[in-house]
Amino acid sequence: MTDKIAVILSGCGVYDGSEVHEASAACTAISRAGKKIAFYAPDKDQFHMVNHVTSEDDTDSKRNVLVESARIARGTVLPLKDFNIEDVDAVIIPGGFGAAKNLCSFATSSEPQVDEDVARILR
């Protein structure tokens, strides 16, 4: 047992990343249980961005999932490609539409695929 829980983030924001309240609630529960948190996210461009004030697509911006995830983590977020299951006791993936856009292609494809690093971790 490592006393560490991995939280895999998919950016920051309910429409194009991790849902902030769900991620925060998970982190609070982990902390209250006396466990450490290790944040991970894919180091890649977000599939698409949303202006969270207007709920409209933001076609002018380009954002990185790892960088945006640091907004929630308020610190270190490790690249998902470096994840090792031996380093943690459990994995949590908070909701938000980013999970369906940045961790897989379920939101965008008629033949959806899971991100290869996510698939490796969940096997």
Give short role names for the model-derived ranges.
Residues M1-R123:
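Extended, subdomain-level signal for the structured scaffold at the beginning of enzyme domains
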